[in-house]
Amino acid sequence: MGAAFHCHAQDNDDFESFRSGLMDGFQSFRQEVLTGYTDFLRTAWEDFNVFRSESRDSKPKPRTAPANHPTPAATPPAPGPAPAVHNNITLDFYGTRLMLPALKVAALRSSDNNGVADFWQALDSQGLGSKTGNALKEIAERHRFNDWMMLKLVETYVSNQLATASADTRIAMRQYLLCHTGYDVRVAQNDGCLALLVPYSTTIYSSSYIDVDGKRFTLVFDAKSGRTTACGSVRTYRLPGERNAGGLIDPVFRQAPRVTESMVSVKLTDKKTSVACNVNANLAKLLYDYPQIPLIEYSRSSLQPSFRKELTSQLRQTTAGMTPEAAVGTMLNLVQHAFKYATDQEQFGFEKPLFPEESAIYGINDCEDRALLFSMLIRQVTGLDCLLVEYPGHVACAVRL
């Protein structure tokens, strides 16, 4: 049985309001949540059952591309790094150079509740939450990072600065910083080590999670620990339900991030249609471990407007004067024949839907990637309504003609 999702142009007003409110209300957030947070950490942690989220689609995809029966017929430059400040470091974040305060912290003495609480107190005594939290938020605002990019920024920053520390120290540090940038990210014990509890705003497929008072938290381990899934139950704390515990991690790119560009020229062609465009290859590095989320969320994201404008403007000229049916057929032919076909397992070794920019960078994709690209072209070139339709082992795009 399939599922259909309506694709439409996104509206960034809600995102801008959310981001502005998040930043403007940070001081009240600290007063409500962070004051006394160590007291909650010191409470007796409870056991929670771990669940495994569903896979997006367990049926294997076809090893060859489905046959096509055709119908007859600008990103702003990334801001430069902030002016040099004493005791700051320069961080390479997927090709974008960022300036952040150097981190000097004592190691976590133990991974139990009191050890984590003591770690928080030591960081608070340095004023680290305000200083570093504000620096991270300023970068996210200036570079238009979404919540998932903030999650990755904190991971990259802590891994760089605490490379020789224990995995538990890095996890505790990441949780502290994410709390101080406005998110309800928590920490838990699992099989002798610490894990982050990340509250996503949408389903994350093929992940371990727990439910705390009706709120789903995805478990995230330190990359150097070798852990990717939970073993047995998880121990963590509760926050009083009436408190503003912080925001969720929204992985959707509501606005295009301002990242350093490493432009490559690509040519997409079939026997009749050819388009040339430039795409930022740095996006492939950034998005390599992007989480598996519902396909409709990919269609709501904006990554590199200049690439999409360049691509769609050429196709708008190519299809000018065509009937809707002929225009749709022309773009379908291009999407089906401009790329080599490979399943995600063959290309990456794991399930990975591609944004249109990634399809252009890799030059290889599968049915779901082509459906995402095709639906974007339909919306932006013709303005026609379309649906992403999911079948077991296959994804298609239905167009209203």
How would you name each of these model-derived features?
Residues M99-A106, N114-E155, L295-Y362:
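Secondary-structure boundary elements
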Residues Q161-R174, A342-A396, R400:
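Active-site neighborhood of thiol-dependent amide/isopeptide-bond enzymes
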Residues C231-A338:
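The feature marks a conserved, polyanion-engaging helical scaffold used by nucleic-acid processing enzymes
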Residues E46-L268:
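Intrinsically disordered, low-complexity N-terminal segments that are enriched in acidic
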Residues F5-A9:
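Sec/Tat signal peptide C-region and signal peptidase I cleavage site
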Residues M1-A3:
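Bacterial N-terminal signal peptides
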Residues Q10-D57:
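N-terminal propeptides/low-complexity segments immediately following signal peptides
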Residues T181, V185-D213, L311, L315, ...:
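Hydrophobic/aromatic-rich core segments of domains that either
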